[in-house]
């Protein structure tokens, strides 16, 4: 049938083996050596807010938009409650009787979501428990061990799982609980990679890079614009808030070297600074910038987010962060430009020899700009890419890659279209975008 045909044509990365770190230690790949470029959508409340039909619709449209990872809050409460009124815990952290005959329980629904994601070629990056719950004392070390064993046993054979410890929390706090959770999962599940989702404007690499259970690093560049401070004790240097490429450079300078990505940049449609609805909203041009900046700086992929999608706003339900489910429910937000433009970044990176790629800012000749005027370059042996957000004139050192003559194109992050500029000698060459 046509339906069966379309399902069979879905690309499933795990058909190339388990997800793992490449031998260069900077990127991800499947076991047979096929490159895996992480392109994530933020679906935090997917397990709690959506029913079966809605979850299937969401995951299918994520696939159509090019996403191959969805980040979820596995539980956002102790207990969490889902669309069907089912709780994630019915006997605390004792999961012995969690599967009840004749009851479509919380974890049955989670199973369904993971299976639907599998059918769409999507990994579920499971933030096991949101960090605020641990900070407020809702899970101790022994409970973390029990929960980790439960998760590991239940999902060790699912091909499309990525474990995420933490959850918008500081990597140097509650460490014994996070360690217990991570190690109890790995005691029963050696099939999946693991990482840590940190607090805003922090990186897991700062405190966890040496941990054996950490296969890759995440940072959360956060939602603030340049110079925007909340007065919450944030120690980040003011004036650099949007420079998410800096987190990549810092992580890739560490030993041991591990892949890294921005797991939470500014969301499309969310107020700048997050909490004040009167502030301007981040737009598609902004979410594109964070993607290209961090990937060209050397990250192994990128996660996108949308204000109305991550909380799955529906008409008649209260929303946070200045979002309105009547004005724009989650399914309408999936039509927004940023959601549908991120695939052009993934397509671009997978076009070229993948594992040889390095960030190289010496490609930019002369003085580079600051803030939005900063160009960022990455290259392989015979190709180079420069992202120039502001479109200012720039000089590019074409000697950095092989060949006496260089063919040059403009590439549009809005639609993935190429425009041929011409062929140039191998030397420092000025370019000015005239589009």
Residue ranges of predicted features:
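Catalytic-core region of carbohydrate-active enzymes that cleave or remodel glycosidic bonds
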Residues: 190, 211-316
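Aromatic- and carboxylate-lined catalytic core of secreted/periplasmic carbohydrate-active enzymes
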Residues: 34, 256-260, 267-271, 283-422, ...
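Bacterial Sec-dependent N-terminal signal peptides
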Residues: 1-7
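Short beta-strand segments
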Residues: 164-166, 195-198, 218, 261-264, ...
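Extracytoplasmic
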Residues: 7-27, 31-34, 43-45, 405, ...
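Short, electropositive alpha-helical surface patch
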Residues: 124-125, 142-151, 279-281, 318-332
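Active-site mouth of glycoside hydrolases
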Residues: 11-228, 233-243
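Tryptophan-centric aromatic hotspots in well-structured domains and transmembrane helices
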Residues: 4, 110, 410-411
């Amino acid at each position: 049938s046509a339906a069966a045909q379309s399902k069979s044509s879905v690309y499933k990365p795990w058909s190339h083996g388990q997800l793992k770190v490449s031998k260069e230690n900077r990127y991800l790949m499947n076991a047979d050596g096929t490159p895996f470029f992480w392109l994530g959508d933020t679906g935090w409340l997917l397990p709690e807010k959506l029913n079966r039909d809605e979850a299937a619709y969401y995951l299918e449209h994520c696939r159509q938009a090019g996403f191959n990872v969805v980040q979820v809050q596995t539980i956002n409460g102790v207990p969490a409650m889902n669309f069907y009124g089912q709780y994630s815990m019915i006997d605390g952290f004792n999961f012995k009787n969690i599967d009840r005959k004749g009851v479509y329980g919380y974890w049955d629904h989670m199973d369904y979501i993971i299976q639907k994601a599998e059918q769409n070629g999507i990994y579920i990056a499971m933030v096991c428990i949101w960090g605020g719950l641990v900070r407020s004392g809702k899970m101790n070390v022994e409970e973390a061990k029990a929960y980790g064993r439960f998760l590991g046993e239940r999902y060790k054979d699912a091909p499309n799982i990525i474990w995420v410890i933490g959850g918008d929390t500081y990597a140097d706090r509650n460490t014994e609980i996070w360690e217990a959770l991570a190690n109890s999962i790995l005691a029963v599940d050696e099939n999946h990679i693991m990482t840590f989702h940190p607090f805003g404007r922090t990186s897991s690499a700062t405190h966890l890079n040496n941990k054996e259970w950490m296969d890759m690093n995440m940072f959360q560049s956060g939602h603030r614009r340049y110079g925007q401070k909340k007065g919450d004790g944030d120690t980040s240097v003011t004036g650099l808030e949007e420079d998410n490429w800096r987190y990549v450079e810092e992580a890739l300078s560490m030993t041991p070297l591990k892949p890294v990505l921005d797991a939470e940049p500014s969301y499309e449609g969310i107020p700048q600074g997050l909490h004040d609805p009167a502030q301007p909203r981040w737009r598609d041009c902004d979410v594109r910038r964070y993607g290209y900046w961090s990937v060209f700086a050397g990250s192994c992929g990128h996660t996108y987010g949308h204000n109305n999608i991550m909380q799955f706003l529906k008409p008649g339900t209260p929303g946070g962060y200045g979002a309105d489910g009547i004005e724009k429910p989650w399914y309408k937000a999936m039509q927004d430009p940023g959601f549908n433009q991120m695939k052009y970044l993934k397509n671009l990176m997978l076009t070229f020899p993948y594992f040889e790629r390095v960030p190289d800012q010496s490609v930019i000749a002369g003085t580079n700009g600051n803030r939005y005027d900063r160009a960022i370059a990455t290259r392989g042996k015979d190709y180079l890419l420069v992202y120039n957000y502001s479109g200012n004139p720039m000089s590019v050192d074409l000697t950095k890659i092989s060949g006496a003559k260089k063919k040059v194109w403009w590439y549009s992050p809005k639609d993935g279209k190429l425009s041929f500029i011409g062929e140039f000698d191998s030397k420092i060459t000025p370019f000015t975008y005239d589009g």
